[in-house]
Swiss-Prot record:
The lineage of its organism: Eukaryota, Metazoa, Ecdysozoa, Arthropoda, Hexapoda. Keywords: Glycoprotein, Glycosidase, Hydrolase, Metal-binding, Zinc. Glycans are attached at N397. Zn(2+) binds at H39, D52. The keyword Hydrolase applies. This is Myrosinase 1. It comes from the Eukaryota. Gene3D superfamilies: Glycosidases (3.20.20.80). The active site is at E167 (nucleophile), E374 (proton donor). Optimum pH is 5.5 with sinigrin as substrate. Pfam families: Glyco_hydro_1. Hydrolyzes glucosinolates to a labile aglycone. This rapidly undergoes spontaneous rearrangement, eliminating sulfur to yield a number of toxic metabolites. Thereby developing a chemical defense system that exploits and mimics the host plant. Transmembrane segments: none annotated.
Length: 464
């Protein structure tokens, strides 16, 4: 196989505001749900750390842009901190210094011929809005719409690529299994309500842009949908094949189906309705869209934005320790062949899973333009990060195979991440960066890893 990425293929890298910026209470920034969580419950973070300073990108953004420029990347995906723009999250009180920070970052990128790709929401809800109920409160979709309006107004003349939500399924986990902020345990219904509100919010932001801003700004909008890819444990078993399809619909059809087809996947509605009845509930745990909401949502992705890291095998059953959603009735496992002896890495590399996922998405949604908005490997932080290089090489080759052999319409690839950063409940114990950050140094010194050199070469040659 000697495939090569086309000349117009978009290579980029990705970060998120809470994970890299620091400056948690500087220049009028308000408190968000991660600030509140790490300050009141530091024990939930593996190493007891927080994102108060993180990579200090609030002060060192020019250094970050210089690194991106050196990599010759086409774009940089970063997220905006809602509470930096509007401290309470309500748009009647904006913070000019927060707006200035993002204007400076965007202008610095453009000055260096780097396209800004902006994520509006990467998990850091202003605490005041959480006090109102957060994403389980339907009113949040209107707050988000007004937040989006401000972003389009202030930045849309230069930003032409937007992501409304990063991995909405992860936000849902924060309401049901205490895996992310706000760290709530609203089992059975919390995650479905949070997902529903995010979808409506996405639809409202998309339609607002379409009607008010797209005619002059001419940008694109999507939503980054994540998840492992599920494959049948026994490829000969009809039960396992059916279970894998159901698991994939619960994992990513949950958000992809409404955005492309207007409603939740039929199999998801059927199973949640049935489980709700079995639990003696008077209605389904999965909210229903109105006809107007179906119309609002259908066709609200200008490209498919995919975050993907790993895959799992599934078989039918009730998992005694369900990772997240017991309503889907599947048990996950890994193929021993995926692992090295005596090793269970944080990310289990299954590159063929990405290829199969790209084919699945092509068949499911009519082969849309697809941008991989996150893919990467976390390790112990060594500079000679050859495991990360191996992971990237294999996943890039799987992407090429999907493009050339399966005719999947992949337009770009984003490596997670540019920098080591605050990896949520793992703190600083896992390192995804092409660039190492010394978190013990007040200067947060940046040092390029072997994977940096590797990825720079891929970008320049088009070959993994």
């Amino acid at each position: 196989m000697d495939y090569k990425f086309p000349k117009d293929f978009m290579f980029g890298t990705s970060t998120a505001s809470y994970q890299i910026e620091g400056g948690w209470n500087e220049d009028g920034k308000g408190e968000n749900i991660w600030d509140r969580l790490v300050h009141t419950s530091p024990e939930v973070i593996k190493d007891g750390t927080n994102g108060d300073i993180a990579c200090d990108s609030y002060h060192k953004y020019k250094e970050d842009v210089a690194i991106i420029k050196d990599l010759n990347l086409k774009f940089y995906r970063f997220s905006i901190s809602w509470a930096r723009i509007a401290p309470s999250g309500v748009m009647n009180s904006l913070e000019p210094k927060g707006i200035a920070y993002y204007n400076n970052l965007i202008n610095e990128l453009i000055k260096n011929d780097i396209i800004p790709l902006v994520t509006m929401y990467h998990w850091d809800l202003p605490q005041y809005l959480q006090d109102l109920g957060g994403w389980v409160n339907p009113i949040m979709s209107d707050y988000f719409k007004e937040y989006a309006r401000v972003l389009f107004t202030y930045f849309g003349d230069r930003v032409k690529w937007w992501i409304t939500f990063n991995e909405p399924i992860a936000v849902c986990k924060g309401y049901s299994i205490k895996a992310y902020a706000p760290n709530l345990n609203l089992k059975t219904t919390g995650h479905y309500l949070a997902g529903h509100t995010q979808l409506i919010a996405h639809g409202k932001a998309y339609r607002l842009y379409e009607e008010m801003f797209k005619p002059t700004q001419n940008g694109k909008i999507s939503i980054s949908i994540s998840g492992v890819f599920f494959m049948p444990k026994n490829a000969e078993s009809d039960d396992d094949i059916e279970t894998a399809e159901r698991a994939n619909q619960f994992e990513r059809g949950w958000f992809g189906h409404p955005v492309y087809k207007g409603d939740y996947p039929p199999i998801m509605k059927k199973w949640v309705d049935q489980k709700s009845k079995e639990e003696g509930l008077p209605w389904s745990k999965l909210p229903k869209f109105t006809k107007d909401e179906i119309k609002l949502l259908k066709g609200t992705a200008d490209f498919y934005a995919l975050n993907h890291y790993s895959s799992r095998l599934v078989t039918f059953g009730s998992d005694p320790n369900p990772n997240f959603n017991p309503d889907a009735s599947y048990v996950t496992s890994v193929d021993e062949a995926w692992l090295k002896p005596n090793e269970t890495p944080y990310i289990i590399p299954v590159p063929e899973g990405l290829r199969k996922l790209l084919i699945w998405l092509k068949n499911e949604y009519g082969n849309p333009q697809l941008l991989i908005t996150e893919n990467g490997y976390g390790d112990d932080g060594q500079l000679d990060d050859f495991e990360k290089i191996s992971y990237l090489k294999n996943y890039l080759n799987a992407t090429l195979q999907a493009m050339y052999e399966d005719k999947c319409n992949v337009i770009g690839y984003t490596v997670w991440s540019l920098l080591d950063n605050f990896e949520w409940f793992y703190g600083y114990s896992i390192h995804f960066g092409l660039v190492k950050i010394d978190f013990n140094d007040p200067q947060r010194t940046r040092t390029k890893r072997e994977s940096y050199t590797y990825f720079k070469n891929v970008v320049s040659t088009g070959k993994p």
